[in-house]
């Protein structure tokens, strides 16, 4: 059975407090004192203290910016080409750093047989997968694939592919790396979608090593389940435009999740022959404070059951597909610190569609 035997996570060097990010957004979005107070309120209610970015500008005086122009209206506003250049200049180095940490002490880089790159915030050909191969001097006959533009649930999709590779190749050493540079796509037009995106999203990278190794402690991947609710297809979307990627994220998304999530979990567990009582740890994508709250309410979870998701949201924001890797790593550290012999983990994430992906794993 395939097993996640190592996890590593990390962020770009520029950390920004939520207060600094509010100040940047306030200068862009607020037209008067009333709007400024409203914006400050939603930022302070976000449940986020700090986020990271490949862009230093969010905490700098306008004269010191390197990405956005030194102008009150941010014109000439960065186009898609400039944003993709920044992705190509920074994503590979961050990915290589985290992959190296992930495999350290487990395997050599030359032992990697499969590479799965996951991102919805940057694309090119040759892409991130080939950049990583070149920088790390990986085997030229390595099998690789890319999970592109699927959104926040894509890490679970990547794990499904890793599980399939391990099932087909007993000696497989699969690396799944989720690299998201969400802040590259900051938009200045005043809209609910842009304001919500500006207060939630962050940059981060998570890598996982998946192997058929029974002797190593880790998360044995047992079951996956996916379901799409098309009634929410207009409420969460991610589209390309000339000025960057555009996010649609309506206030109805938490209600959609609240309506369907408990039923989804029940169906996923039933298909795996499990019940809620079997689950010791819940690994939920920290898509936002309201989303975590409705999950707690709909599933009637005891306080503290989603503590790791809340912690990731507070310290890093929403890093799209990388977020759930951060949560899973925190669960792993807790189990290791407590010398726990075994645990049952249920994970779930959400994205455009509205798509809900889940996984079931045993720590052993």
Give short role names for the model-derived ranges.
Residues 42, 46-137, 276-292:
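Conserved beta-ketoacyl condensing-enzyme motif
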Residues 48, 90-104, 161, 205, ...:
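Short, well-ordered amphipathic alpha-helical segments that serve as non-catalytic structural scaffolds
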Residues 1-86, 182, 186-259, 263, ...:
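Condensing-enzyme catalytic core mediating Claisen C-C bond formation in acyl metabolism
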Residues 123-138, 176-187, 234-238, 292-306:
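Acidic-glycine-rich active-site phosphate/pyrophosphate-binding loop
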Residues 2, 109-113, 140-143, 169-174, ...:
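Short coil/turn connectors at secondary-structure junctions
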Residues 140-141, 147, 154-161, 178-198, ...:
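Active-site glycine-rich loop that binds ribose-phosphate moieties when present
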Residues 67-70, 82, 86, 97, ...:
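A contiguous, well-structured pocket-lining segment that forms one wall/lid of small-molecule binding clefts
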Residues 96, 120-121, 139-141, 146-167, ...:
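Claisen-condensing/thiolase-fold acyl-transfer catalytic domains that form or cleave C-C bonds
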């Amino acid at each position: 059975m395939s097993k996640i035997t190592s996890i590593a996570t990390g962020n770009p060097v520029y950390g920004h407090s939520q207060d600094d990010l509010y100040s940047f957004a306030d200068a862009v979005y607020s037209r008067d004192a009333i709007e400024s107070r409203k914006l400050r309120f939603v930022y302070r209610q976000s449940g986020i203290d700090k986020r990271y970015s490949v862009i230093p500008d969010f905490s700098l005086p306008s004269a010191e910016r390197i990405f956005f122009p030194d102008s009150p209206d941010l014109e000439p506003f960065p186009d898609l080409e400039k944003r993709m250049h920044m992705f190509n200049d920074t994503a590979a180095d961050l990915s290589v750093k985290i992959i190296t940490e992930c495999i350290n002490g487990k395997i050599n880089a030359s032992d990697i047989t499969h590479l799965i790159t996951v991102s919805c915030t940057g694309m090119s050909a040759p892409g991130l997968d080939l950049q990583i191969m070149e920088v790390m001097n990986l085997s030229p006959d390595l099998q690789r694939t890319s999970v592109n533009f699927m959104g926040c649930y894509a890490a679970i999709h990547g794990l499904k592919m890793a599980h399939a590779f391990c099932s087909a190749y007993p000696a497989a050493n699969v690396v799944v790396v989720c690299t998201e540079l969400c802040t590259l796509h900051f938009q200045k037009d005043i809209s609910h979608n842009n304001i919500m995106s500006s207060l939630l999203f962050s940059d981060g990278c998570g890598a996982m090593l998946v192997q058929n190794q029974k002797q190593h402690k880790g998360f044995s991947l047992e079951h996956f389940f996916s379901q799409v609710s098309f009634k929410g297809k207009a409420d969460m979307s991610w589209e390309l435009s000339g000025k960057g990627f555009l996010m649609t994220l309506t206030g109805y998304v938490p209600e959609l999740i609240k309506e369907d999530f408990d039923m989804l979990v029940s169906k996923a567990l039933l298909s795996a022959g499990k019940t809620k009582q079997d689950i010791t740890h819940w690994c939920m994508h920290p898509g936002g404070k309201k989303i975590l709250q409705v999950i707690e309410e709909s599933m009637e979870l005891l306080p503290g059951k989603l503590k790791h998701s809340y912690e990731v949201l507070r310290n890093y924001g929403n890093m799209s597909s990388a977020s759930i890797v951060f949560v899973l790593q925190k669960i792993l550290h807790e189990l290791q610190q407590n010398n726990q012999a075994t645990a049952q983990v249920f994970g779930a994430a959400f994205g455009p569609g509205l798509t809900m992906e889940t996984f079931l794993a045993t720590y052993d």
